[in-house]
């Protein structure tokens, strides 16, 4: 079986899909919301599960069943339209929904900041308002038209202020302010009883007001009689005594002609009828009051006869003053003189109005009374006086306000929600005239006003359709030119510039990815394949469905309803509402809950939308793509397997059979060369029934087939190792005891998982890279990790220990002497000697005094390390193992470990080690020590009482006394127990098997001082020990610590786990990509001292495992340094192993500060060290003075000046590192400090102070990942040694993950504690352990402890001054003599002394320093060094050893990004974070391409333009220089250059699109940044990796706009797309290596059997 791999996927691109693309993915349109038919359970046609669209539900069978079977594959059934294929298609084939109205994609609308908002330049809130058909709350004045003049307005029609302002610009008409009526009281009732009078009048807006007057009246009645002549008219005013009717003389009536008389008594009239022969007509006379006829009825009369008598009518006088009112019965007739004559008796009243009310009613009111009607108080006059929301002018309003006070309210301004629209098209002239432009948002009232004035020259719309029009109208090229032009005018740091740059970036991204902006508005929605959103039948016949189906259903329902509404020509408002609902439905399908309230199911649980399927821990990325399940695996409890070799494990038979089933089956079939189905069945049965032959085959297969064992939590790579399985009975996996430390396993019920590597390549990797015998050395620190412990150590110690009298026994007194080791063995076997008896043995021609136990142990040790006079405890065994590994390699070491294990277990058993309480001897010294301490404490108390000590000092002294006493008791106890070397407790502690001196002290000495809950030490110690027992008080004091310990452990585990996740995330892509990046930079090797002066790391540890960046010169000879023992030369690229590190770390020589010398100018040679002129000379009038540095230029000038010799002063110490502190003899000022690189100024200061010589070491520059210049990852040389095998690291090694694991794995051992150093407020709390590590990795701005001060210069502490307020100031004099002042905050203490020398970055006070401050004031190297020291210190304090290079990788990632200050001519924005190497590369490319500008200008002539050219001309106008497809001429080129166009995109002869730069570009200006690890992992190059970390939708949105390509450089990205990671054997350079599994030949198989 051969296996190779090729990388299938080179990159993954994400883009915005166009409607055409969405439809091209689809196999059909989903038109119905139905899913499955409830009767047949078959998918509904055109529904969400339609077989025609998505493929058949049964394999190779159409829906109607006409075609069945694979032979019809590809046939489309003509009955049901289903294509015959595998049901797998239902996981692949997509559908789509064609939307009736466009819908905005919520990701682009609601990203933060919103992409559509930035692109269109419309604020996000307003944009959302447009999309969701929102309104705008407007308060505006009301105006009413009073004179329309020549317009189409009607008198009385109302306008709002905004409309009026628009109309009045073009039209002439008059308006007055108006009000709107609110809550008028109804109905109108009369407040008095009285008579009704009704009248009508018109207002100035031609609207009618009806007046109802009600009057309450007092009346004087006067009777009037026929014939009376009235002096007054109805309504006239009279005074009392006025004559209404004057006295009048009535003459008799005479007959006018001959005739007959008729008297009518009822009407009081007399009629004369003429004779029938006469032509006269009858005449009637009314008889006035008091006139009587003188003739009888029917009498005949002659002309002139008297008919009546004459009389006098009396005068009628007004009895009261008042108003005249004619009674209803009064009948009058007007006369020519204007007076009235009474025709019939009646009544006249003189009225006085007692009370009168007027009720104006607006047109439209319903009146319930009639004119003249008498009504009572409370009667209803009309249903209302005004309508709700009636508009009135101010004058009209005043009438009603006067007559109906407090019966209604009126508003002169109205607050309304006006629907808004966005302008999508506007004529240029209209735009200039109105000041509006495309994209402006106005209310629909304003829009219709503009439409009236300008017609179709202006168009506006709302909803997604409007956004789509706006996006379609965008000319991106023009927009780009406009933004670039505007950017030149604003300051780069302003907020406006940032907005413009964001917009410019989006425009450029859209152009680059060839995305049309309108694609962000959806016309069609893809429907995911049905098997990804299944519907399953649950018991009870109900169906359970994925949330997506519900969300799709809502979209289809609303879409179909909208379609119907369009067909029915529904009103605009209903259609708008339906469009809004469709938009919301699509929003919740894409990202439920992003806009407004989330759609929930009946239990109130939000439905999971497409976005929810991607993001978060449970999303597609982290759940399925990065967290896959593993096939061929099992897990079981582990038990110890002491008989195993280190590379073996015991695998339970049953488990092995299950895991290797396919292999066993294949082998069984292979044996008999059978392939038939029945044969398979038979062989399967053999396996299932567990017949012996199955196990025989299994035994054979398992040989040489490694398995992987893994124990969770997998904190580092040693938690997953390969073993060769051995079949065992039982159900538990057997584990070799020596691999317990790397797995952190014990046998108290731990479980482990087993995995089977399948392919030949995987097996090879497991066998050669992961086998446990190759993982003895830890990659964290390069020392062994698979180490014997517990009983093995105790056994080996017991074997090699001696009696206490061993050393004092003289050789002549030794009873047993042997000629050989074998002979001693015989004596032991026969019982003559015991293991620990002193014996003399001849070994290698020498007689040595030893014990038989030591002889046994020496037999397994390599020859070079045999030692017959050594007791082997844990430390000695560790050294032995490490030395064996260094000398003989990993295989011999593994064998040695197995031998140690076997011996250890055997002799631990023989030793019969037991523990009893009586084994804890209590030292007689103990009481004395305690008594002395008590006496000292009493003294202190007395001094305190007398006032010689402060409370703080007393506390500190007491603590100190008891701490010393405890230590003395500890030593005394150990010494006392050790008097009997066979004391089991002493054996356990001294060997390092279990327990330590501290625990022994507590058991048999005294428990000592305890801490209280805050961590402050309690000054009363526990004097008792556990053997004697504690008093109640002592027991109580000791509980604090125990509780705190338990709480800490629980908190630590989770914090450490999260720290590891962040570390891995930030460093995962750091892989060794090349053997050598070629850099000459490096870091200076130095002793690491933390800010408080603690030595964190010795020089030899700093050097171990690194590669030299420069040659190391011997300070004495100035030649390359040579190791005298090994003869190794320390030149560039030498890898420093353990022995080299020890040599270089301890090598130093004493050399003179200055020597005199001279240069022979006849054959000049410059000295190796720095030198200066010791005499003056002049050449060409230039004076070369004493003290000038001598270089070749000076030598040449001296030769030309005719000198033969040149006297010089040589300073050999310059460039060397001092290993001592040199003080001035005058004022004991520090001239040079330990580990200081001596510079010229320092050397001269030494010379001035008459210092003759200094002890120095060479300056050693080593390669470091911090200075590596590899484009991606790091190079082998900068990384140095792979600590797990002590070889230079291989290309492909995943050093980032190893670093993260090495730092994260011991995280749980770091304490959480924040110690008090004893003081309450005076000394700072020191944050330690995990919180401090996190504080540093996260580069916290806010530190838990007070901030310290550091020096920014190299110099001396001149003075330390304290002012009255207690503030201290430190003055530092630099080497140039300038003074620098540093103020020390009150909360911290000064950490330097007067005369002390300080170096840049050195702490001047206690307290922590912010790394960012160091970066700002010093440089990157100082920051990296500070971080390294401080992080390393956290681990060193807890006794955890981790190599610097691991921390350096994390620090490199934290310092890897730079912040763009000025993007120059690149697409970055100010504030963008970019990798340093990327910026350097881009700047280099810009500078290189700037050189080619002239040649490009020639090349571009005659080529065809791919884009039209647009730029801003001198007048600030955007102009088009050339059209797309036009040929570039000299003229066009000249114009383009003049207007500042820097790139031309053209088509060359073959039609390829090429970009030519025609103007020089500006490079990026940047500043270095220190990022916290969380931020550093988010700031990734690839979008896949970033999307899978946090903020998935945001990352994908931005990536799609950009058309981002992920080149799959990191590890996570490749895991996501499912191919090998580019690390280790997954690197491209190993891609074509063929791994063959050679078949074993028959003879070989027989041998093995």
Swiss-Prot record:
Coiled coil: none annotated. It comes from the Bacteria. The keyword Cell membrane does not apply. It holds the Pfam family RNA_pol_Rpb1_1. The keyword Transferase applies. Zn(2+) 1 binds at residues 62, 64, 77, 80. Zn(2+) 2 binds at residues 1077, 1268, 1275, 1278. It catalyses: RNA(n) + a ribonucleoside 5'-triphosphate = RNA(n+1) + diphosphate. Its EC number is 2.7.7.6. Keywords: DNA-directed RNA polymerase, Magnesium, Metal-binding, Nucleotidyltransferase, Transcription, Transferase, Zinc. One of its GO terms (cellular component) is DNA-directed RNA polymerase complex. Mg(2+) binds at residues 746, 748, 750. It is an enzyme of class 2 (transferase). One of its GO terms (molecular function) is magnesium ion binding. Its cofactor is Mg(2+); Zn(2+). Binds 1 Mg(2+) ion per subunit. SMART domains: RPOLA_N. GO terms for biological process: DNA-templated transcription. DNA-dependent RNA polymerase catalyzes the transcription of DNA into RNA using the four ribonucleoside triphosphates as substrates. The RNAP catalytic core consists of 2 alpha, 1 beta, 1 beta' and 1 omega subunit. When a sigma factor is associated with the core the holoenzyme is formed, which can initiate transcription. Belongs to the RNA polymerase beta' chain family. This is DNA-directed RNA polymerase subunit beta'. It comes from Thermosipho africanus (strain TCF52B).
């Amino acid at each position: 079986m051969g296996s190779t791999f090729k990388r299938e996927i080179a990159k993954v691109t994400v883009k915005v899909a166009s409607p055409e693309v969405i439809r091209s993915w689809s196999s059909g349109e989903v038109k119905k919301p139905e899913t499955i038919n409830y009767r047949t359970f078959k998918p509904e046609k055109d529904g969400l599960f339609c077989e025609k669209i998505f493929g058949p539900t049964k394999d190779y069978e159409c829906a109607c069943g006409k075609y069945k079977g694979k032979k019809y594959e590809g046939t489309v059934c003509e009955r049901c339209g289903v294509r015959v294929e595998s049901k797998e298609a239902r996981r692949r084939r997509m559908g789509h929904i064609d939307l009736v109205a466009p819908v905005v994609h919520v990701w682009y609308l609601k990203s933060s900041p919103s992409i559509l908002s930035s692109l269109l330049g419309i604020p996000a809130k307003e944009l959302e308002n447009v999309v969701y058909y929102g309104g705008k709350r407007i308060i505006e004045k009301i105006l009413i038209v009073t004179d329309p003049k020549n317009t189409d307005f009607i008198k009385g029609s109302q306008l709002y202020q905004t409309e009026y302002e628009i109309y009045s610009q073009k039209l002439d008409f008059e308006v007055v302010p108006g009000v709107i009526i609110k809550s008028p009281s109804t109905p109108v009732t009369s407040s008095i009883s009285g008579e009704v009078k009704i009248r009508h009048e018109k207002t100035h807006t031609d609207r009618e007001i009806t007046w109802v007057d009600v009057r309450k009246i007092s009346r004087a009645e006067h009777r009037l009689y026929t014939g009376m002549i009235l002096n007054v008219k109805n309504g006239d005013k009279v005074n009392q005594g006025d004559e209404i009717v004057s006295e009048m003389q009535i003459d008799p009536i005479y007959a006018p002609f001959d005739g007959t008389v008729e008297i009518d008594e009822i009407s009081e009239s007399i009629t004369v009828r003429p004779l029938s022969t006469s032509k006269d007509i009858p005449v009637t006379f009314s008889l006035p009051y008091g006139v009587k006829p003188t003739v009888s009825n029917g009498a005949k009369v002659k002309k002139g006869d008297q008919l009546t008598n004459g009389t006098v009518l009396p005068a009628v006088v007004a009895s009261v003053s008042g108003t005249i009112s004619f009674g209803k019965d009064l009948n009058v007739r007007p006369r020519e003189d204007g007076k009235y004559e009474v025709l019939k008796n009646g009544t006249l009243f003189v009225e006085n109005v007692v009370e009168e009310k007027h009720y104006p009613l607006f047109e439209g009111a319903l009146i319930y009374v009639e004119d003249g009607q008498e009504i009572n108080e409370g009667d209803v006059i009309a249903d209302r006086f005004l309508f709700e929301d009636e508009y009135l002018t101010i004058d009209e309003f005043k009438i009603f306000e006067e007559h109906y006070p407090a019966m209604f309210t009126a508003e002169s301004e109205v607050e309304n929600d006006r629907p808004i629209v966005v302008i999508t098209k506007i004529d240029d002239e209209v735009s200039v005239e109105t000041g509006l432009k495309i994209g402006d948002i106005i209310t629909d009232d304003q829009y219709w006003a503009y439409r009236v004035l300008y017609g179709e020259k202006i168009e506006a719309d709302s909803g997604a359709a409007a956004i789509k029009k706006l996006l379609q109208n965008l000319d991106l090229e023009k927009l780009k030119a406009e933004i670039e032009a505007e950017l030149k005018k604003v300051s780069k740091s302003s907020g406006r510039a940032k907005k413009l740059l964001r917009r410019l970036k989006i425009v450029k991204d859209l152009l680059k990815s060839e995305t049309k902006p309108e694609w962000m508005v959806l016309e069609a929605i893809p429907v995911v394949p049905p098997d990804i959103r299944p519907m399953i039948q649950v018991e009870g016949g109900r169906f359970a469905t994925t949330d997506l189906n519900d969300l799709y259903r809502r979209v289809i329902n609303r879409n179909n309803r909208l379609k119907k509404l369009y067909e029915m020509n529904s009103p605009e408002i209903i259609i708008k509402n339906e469009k809004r609902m469709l938009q919301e439905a699509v929003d919740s399908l894409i990202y439920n809950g992003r806009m407004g309230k989330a759609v929930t199911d009946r239990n109130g649980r939000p439905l999971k939308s497409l976005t929810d399927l991607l993001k978060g821990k449970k999303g597609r990325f982290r759940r399925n793509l990065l967290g896959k399940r593993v096939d061929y695996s099992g897990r079981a409890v582990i038990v110890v397997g002491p008989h195993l070799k280190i590379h073996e494990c015991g695998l339970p038979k049953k488990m092995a059979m299950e895991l290797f089933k396919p292999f066993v089956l294949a082998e069984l079939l292979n044996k008999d060369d059978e392939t038939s189905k029945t044969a398979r069945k038979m062989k399967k049965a053999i396996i299932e029934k567990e017949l012996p032959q199955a196990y025989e085959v299994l035994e054979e297969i398992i040989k040489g087939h490694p398995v992987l064992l893994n124990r969770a939590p997998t904190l580092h790579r040693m938690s997953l190792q390969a073993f060769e399985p051995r079949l065992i009975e039982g159900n538990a996996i057997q584990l070799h005891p020596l691999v317990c430390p790397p797995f952190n396993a014990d046998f108290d019920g731990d479980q482990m998982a087993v995995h089977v590597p399948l392919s030949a390549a995987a097996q090879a990797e497991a066998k050669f890279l992961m086998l446990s015998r190759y993982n003895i050395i830890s990659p964290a620190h390069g020392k062994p990790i698979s180490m014997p412990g517990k009983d093995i150590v105790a056994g080996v110690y017991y074997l090699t220990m001696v009696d206490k009298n061993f050393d004092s026994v003289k050789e002549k007194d030794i009873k047993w002497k042997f000629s050989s080791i074998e002979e001693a063995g015989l004596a032991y076997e026969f019982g003559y000697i015991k293991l620990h008896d002193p014996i003399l043995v001849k070994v290698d021609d020498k007689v040595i005094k030893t014990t038989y136990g030591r002889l046994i142990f020496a037999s397994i040790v390599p020859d070079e390390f045999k030692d017959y006079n050594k007791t082997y405890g844990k430390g000695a065994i560790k050294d032995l193992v490490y030395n064996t590994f260094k000398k003989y390699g990993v295989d011999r070491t593994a064998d040695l470990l197995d031998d140690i294990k076997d011996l250890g277990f055997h002799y631990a058993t023989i030793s019969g080690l037991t523990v009893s309480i009586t084994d804890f001897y209590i030292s007689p010294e103990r009481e004395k020590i305690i008594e002395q301490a008590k006496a000292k404490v009493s003294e202190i108390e007395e001094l305190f009482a007398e006032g010689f000590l402060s409370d703080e000092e007393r506390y500190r002294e007491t603590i100190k006394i008891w701490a010393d006493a405890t230590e003395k008791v500890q030593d005394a106890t150990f010494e006392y127990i050790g008097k009997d070397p066979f004391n089991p407790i002493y054996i356990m502690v001294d060997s390092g098997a279990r327990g330590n001196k501290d625990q022994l002290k507590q058991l048999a000495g005294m428990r000592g001082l305890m801490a209280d809950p805050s961590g402050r030490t309690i000054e009363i110690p526990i004097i008792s020990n556990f053997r004697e027992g504690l008093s109640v008080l002592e027991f109580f004091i000791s509980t604090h610590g125990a509780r705190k310990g338990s709480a800490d452990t629980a908190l630590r585990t989770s914090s450490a786990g999260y720290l590891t996740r962040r570390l891995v995330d930030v460093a995962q892509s750091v892989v060794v990509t090349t053997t050598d990046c070629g850099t000459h930079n490096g870091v200076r090797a130095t002793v690491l001292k933390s800010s408080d002066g603690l030595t964190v790391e010795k020089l030899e540890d700093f050097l171990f495992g690194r590669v030299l960046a420069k040659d190391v010169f011997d300070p004495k000879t100035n030649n390359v340094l040579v190791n005298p023992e090994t003869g190794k030369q320390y030149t560039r690229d030498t890898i420093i192993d353990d022995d080299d590190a020890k040599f270089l770390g301890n090598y130093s020589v004493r050399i003179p500060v200055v020597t005199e010398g001279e240069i022979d100018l006849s054959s000049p040679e410059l000295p190796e060290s720095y030198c200066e002129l010791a005499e003056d000379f002049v050449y060409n009038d230039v004076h070369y003075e004493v003290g000038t540095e001598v270089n070749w230029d000076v030598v040449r000038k001296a030769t030309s000046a005719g000198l033969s010799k040149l006297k010089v002063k040589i300073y050999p110490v310059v460039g060397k590192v001092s290993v001592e502190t040199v003080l001035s003899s005058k004022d004991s000022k520090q001239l040079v400090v330990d580990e200081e690189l001596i510079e010229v100024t320092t050397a001269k200061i030494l010379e001035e102070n008459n210092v003759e010589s200094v002890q120095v070491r060479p300056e050693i520059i080593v390669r470091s990942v911090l200075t590596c210049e590899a484009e991606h990852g790091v190079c082998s040389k900068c990384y140095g040694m792979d600590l797990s095998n002590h070889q230079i690291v291989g290309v492909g090694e995943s050093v980032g993950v190893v670093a993260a694991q090495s730092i994260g794995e011991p995280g749980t051992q770091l304490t959480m504690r924040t110690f008090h150093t004893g003081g309450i407020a005076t000394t700072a709390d020191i944050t330690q352990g995990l919180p401090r590590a996190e504080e540093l990795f996260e580069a916290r701005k806010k530190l838990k402890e007070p901030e310290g001060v550091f020096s920014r210069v190299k110099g001396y502490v001149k003075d330390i001054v304290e002012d009255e307020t207690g503030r201290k100031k430190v003055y530092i004099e630099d080497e140039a003599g300038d003074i620098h002042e540093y103020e020390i905050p009150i909360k911290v203490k000064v950490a330097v002394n007067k005369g002390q020398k300080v170096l840049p970055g050195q702490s001047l006070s206690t307290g922590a320093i912010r790394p960012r401050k160091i970066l700002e004031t010093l440089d990157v190297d100082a920051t990296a060094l500070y971080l390294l020291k401080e992080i390393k210190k956290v681990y060193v304090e807890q006794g955890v050893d981790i190599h610097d290079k691991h921390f350096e990788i994390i620090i490199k990632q934290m310092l890897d990004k730079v912040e763009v200050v000025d993007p120059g001519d690149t697409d970055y924005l100010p504030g963008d974070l970019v990798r340093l190497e990327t910026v350097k590369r881009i700047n280099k490319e810009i500078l290189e391409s700037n050189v080619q500008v002239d040649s490009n200008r020639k090349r571009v002539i005659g080529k065809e333009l791919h884009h039209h050219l647009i730029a801003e001309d001198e007048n600030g106008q955007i102009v088009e220089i050339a059209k797309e497809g036009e040929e570039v001429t000299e003229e066009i080129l000249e114009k383009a250059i003049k207007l500042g166009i820097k790139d031309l995109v053209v088509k060359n002869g073959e039609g390829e699109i090429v970009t030519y730069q025609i103007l020089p570009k500006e490079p990026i200006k940047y500043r270095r940044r220190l990022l916290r690890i969380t931020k550093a992992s988010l700031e990734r190059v690839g979008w896949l990796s970033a999307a899978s970390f946090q903020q998935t939708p945001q990352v994908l949105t931005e990536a799609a706009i950009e058309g981002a390509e992920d080149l799959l450089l990191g590890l996570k990205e490749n895991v996501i797309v499912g191919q090998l990671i580019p690390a280790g054997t997954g690197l491209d350079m190993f891609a074509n290596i063929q791994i063959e599994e050679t078949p074993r030949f028959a003879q070989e198989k027989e041998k093995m059997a």
